[in-house]
Regions:
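ATP-binding/phosphotransfer module of carbohydrate and carboxylate kinases, centering on a glycine-rich
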Residues: 1-66, 104, 108-110, 154-328
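Phosphate-binding/catalytic loop of phosphoryl-transfer enzymes
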Residues: 70, 75-169, 316-328
């Protein structure tokens, strides 16, 4: 059985997917920051060698003696691939926004990603393109899971200052952060933040914020609105510089935050209508790793609409965890 291996190595997790040349998903794996034994790294825990290797092995264990013709992905280097497979297996670097556009069958359009990090990418019908943000948590990642998590930590820190700052997030945020330091006899939120925690840990708090926003907490709701507004500002910059405000193009929303938070997505779409009324917002119909796999098959000259449909259907059926809406 000849296959391709697709890898989506993000800030908090790594997805790996084995697909046959006919488009059938036959093996998949995921390793996230929340799992014991996952790796850590300054470029994002999902891109660490340990995390990538664990996700790949999970996927490969399900396909036995399959022949891997090519490995395609982003957030992972060719040296990591060759270290596992040797020089005989080809490596195809894929850009994250291309995988998102592939999922909706578009060559031109806008991709807005809000996961652990954040960016907006645009490509017009004339081929002119622009990629903004993805600068990391210190310089950018506006509207990202990290951005949301940091606002949640700050809200928890000042929740007791005055009744107007009260939020149901306070105790759950402290508990979530302390869980990342299980061997500490006494946990201090100040010490935790001064210890430069992994950005994936901070981004994981976005899930808490969304849950408390849905439960009615005003502070949590405002955090989501603020984050969505920030991503919309990046969208405005891209659309304006490329003169795409009135173009009828897809706006593909992807990343755990954009696809996992109803409130965030709805507010972002409302802002999109104000900024670029011609754009058509749509959430990515499947995990980005499926887009990576499709691009790998396309690069081999064997991808068409039937292969795409088969790939997406088999991914959605075979990997419910991968297609889940975990934020961050």
């Amino acid at each position: 059985m000849q296959c391709v291996l697709a890898i989506d190595a993000g800030g908090s997790k790594c997805d790996a997917l084995v697909v046959t040349l006919a488009g059938d998903a036959v093996g998949w794996g995921r390793c996230s920051v929340k799992e014991l034994g996952s790796g850590r790294g300054p470029g994002g825990s999902g891109r660490s060698a340990t995390t990538v290797r664990r996700a790949m092995l999970q996927a490969l264990e399900q396909v036995g003696g399959a022949q891997i013709l090519e490995v395609a992905g982003y957030g992972v280097g060719s040296e990591q691939v060759r270290g596992h497979f040797g020089p005989a297996v080809r490596f195809r670097g894929v850009r994250e926004h291309d995988a998102a556009l592939a999922l909706v069958g578009a060559e031109a359009g806008i991709v807005a990603l809000a996961g652990t990090g954040a960016f907006v990418y645009g490509r017009g019908p004339d081929g002119a393109d622009l990629h903004l943000d993805a600068l990391g948590p210190l310089l950018g990642d506006y509207g990202s899971g990290y951005h949301i998590g940091l606002m949640a930590i700050r809200a928890a820190a000042r929740a007791s200052w005055h009744p107007r700052h009260a939020t149901s997030l306070a105790e759950p945020v402290v508990q979530a952060c302390s869980a990342f330091r299980p061997n500490r006899a006494r946990f201090s939120l100040v010490e935790y933040m001064l210890g430069n925690p992994d950005r994936a840990e901070i981004a994981s708090l976005a899930e808490l914020v969304d849950a408390h926003a849905e439960a009615g907490d005003a502070v949590a709701r405002q955090i989501l609105i603020t984050a969505a507004d920030e991503l919309a500002e990046t969208l405005w910059d891209v659309v304006d510089r490329l003169s795409l405000a009135n173009e009828h193009l897809p706006l593909v929303g992807t990343g755990g935050v954009l696809t996992g938070s109803r409130r965030y997505w709805e507010h972002f779409c409302d802002r999109c209508k104000e900024i670029a009324p011609g754009l058509e917002p749509v959430q990515a119909p499947g995990p980005l790793v499926a887009g990576v796999a499709f691009l790998a098959l396309k690069g081999l000259g064997i991808a068409d609409s039937q292969v795409y449909d088969r790939l997406l259907q088999s991914v959605l059926k075979a990997s419910p965890q991968m297609c889940g809406r975990a934020l961050g």
